[in-house]
Amino acid sequence: MPSVFVQGRPTASYPPFAPEAGRGAVRRVTEVGEEVLHRPCRDVTEFGPDLAALIDDMFRTMYVAEGAGLAANQVGVDLRLFVYDCPDDEGVRHVGHLVNPVLDALDPAARRLLDEGEGCLSVPGAVMAVPRPDRAVVRGLDKDGVPLLVEGTGYFARCLAHETDHVNGHVYLDRLSGRERKAALRQSADRREEVFARRAANAAAFAA
């Protein structure tokens, strides 16, 4: 089994950070409550240098914020797009981006739900148990408009489902009870200062 998949394809070797991050700039991460996170994003219809530059910025922002995935509306851009650099439960690394992603519906009889911890860069510092299927299949396009299919299991399946939720206008708090949502927001308030200090240090390290 290859140790790295890039854009859903096995790759012999890959650097610690996606090359896109070296070209990108850090953008502000939007937070829960901001309108752009709570409405469905627009389809990407223009493929070109502006889209490529956005992907570069998203990779750099994701690494600085210590995320496994990042959707465009998490940097304030109302487009159906996300990037990811995420391991699965077997330790295989998955890196890439998806434009106009659509999550396949799984046969309920064949799927297994995993009720495990999940966080979000737009709810800084909070982690709550969220049930998600242990497998995900997402179809979309790459930055050049070429069709892509990406499959994930375990933690990577959770990442794919989480990021597809984002472009559909949902955050993981929407999957929690009212009491759990309040607990997550309290966690975020308590840990916010620590999270933002780490992000600032990471941004400085990337710029060095």
UniProtKB/Swiss-Prot annotation:
Catalytic residue positions: 163
Keyword terms: Hydrolase, Iron, Metal-binding, Protein biosynthesis
CDD domains: Pep_deformylase
Cofactor note: Binds 1 Fe(2+) ion.
Keyword Iron appears in the UniProt entry: yes
SUPFAM superfamilies given in the database record: Peptide deformylase (SSF56420)
Pfam families xrefs: Pep_deformylase
InterPro entries hit by this protein: Peptide_deformylase, Peptide_deformylase_sf
Superkingdom of the organism of origin: Bacteria
E.C. code: 3.5.1.88
GO annotation, biological process: co-translational protein modification; translation
The protein's enzyme class: hydrolase
Entry keyword annotation includes Iron: yes
GO function term, MF aspect, one: metal ion binding
Binding-site residues, Fe cation: 120, 162, 166
Catalytic activity: N-terminal N-formyl-L-methionyl-[peptide] + H2O = N-terminal L-methionyl-[peptide] + formate
Cofactor section: Fe(2+)
Function: Removes the formyl group from the N-terminal Met of newly synthesized proteins. Requires at least a dipeptide for an efficient rate of reaction. N-terminal L-methionine is a prerequisite for activity but the enzyme has broad specificity at other positions.
NCBIfam families per the UniProt record, alphabetical: pept_deformyl (TIGR00079), PRK00150.1-3 (NF001159)
Protein family per UniProt: Belongs to the polypeptide deformylase family.
Protein name: Peptide deformylase 3
Source organism of the structure: Streptomyces coelicolor (strain ATCC BAA-471 / A3(2) / M145)
Gene: def3
